[in-house]
């Protein structure tokens, strides 16, 4: 996070480690990354440092796997976050749905995804799918954090991000989705980190 923006807008950054677990409460493990970030860490920061005392002042941001995690966590704990920014998000639930033991997608194998997401035959209908969480909020009329997304046009995750963008649009869920030239790299993320922080703190 650029220090000049931290000083300009007077905000603190809390950066936990998700250990390549997609920031999920691993359905096949006892790891609770989503609950930790979305509830426990927020509560700890508020009690200990007296920071981000309201959801309107609490934002969550991530890139790649962290982009998936930021969206999923914001939708799982919408009362704790005012805005979510996600860049080049690894929104791969449709890609891994139905994967069988012994299979892989060139990035990881069935065992890894099963450990993170649980039953891959039912992952599309599960709470590991951000689509399920945000649609549930929308259908019930509950608050949805403001959504900001971006992806580079040369990013290998572009179609996954476009698919999620189309899903939100079809469901009538307000969001900002931006594309521009760029790959899955720090050049793109540095640009959109600045753009999104300026946008998030512009109000």
Set out the residue ranges of the language-model regions.
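Non-catalytic cap/lid and distal C-terminal segments of serine-dependent acyl enzymes
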Residues: 1-203
């Amino acid at each position: 996070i650029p220090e000049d923006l931290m000083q300009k807008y007077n905000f603190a950054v809390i950066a936990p480690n998700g250990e390549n677990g997609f920031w999920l409460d691993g359905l096949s493990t006892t790891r609770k990354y989503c609950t930790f970030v979305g509830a426990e860490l927020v509560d700890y920061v508020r009690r200990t440092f007296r920071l981000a005392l309201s959801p309107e002042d609490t934002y969550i941001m991530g890139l790649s796997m962290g982009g998936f995690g930021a969206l999923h966590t914001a939708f799982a704990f919408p009362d704790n976050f005012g805005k979510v920014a996600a860049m080049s998000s690894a929104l791969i639930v449709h890609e891994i749905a139905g994967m069988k033991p012994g299979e892989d997608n060139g990035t990881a194998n069935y065992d890894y995804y099963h450990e993170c997401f649980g039953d891959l035959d039912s992952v599309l209908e599960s709470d590991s799918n951000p689509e399920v969480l945000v649609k549930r909020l929308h259908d019930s009329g509950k608050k949805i954090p403001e959504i900001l997304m971006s992806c580079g046009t040369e990013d290998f995750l572009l179609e996954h991000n476009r698919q999620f963008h189309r899903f939100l649009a079809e469901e009538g869920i307000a969001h900002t989705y931006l594309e521009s030239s760029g790959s899955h790299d720090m050049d793109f993320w540095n640009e959109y980190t600045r753009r999104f922080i300026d946008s998030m703190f512009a109000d």
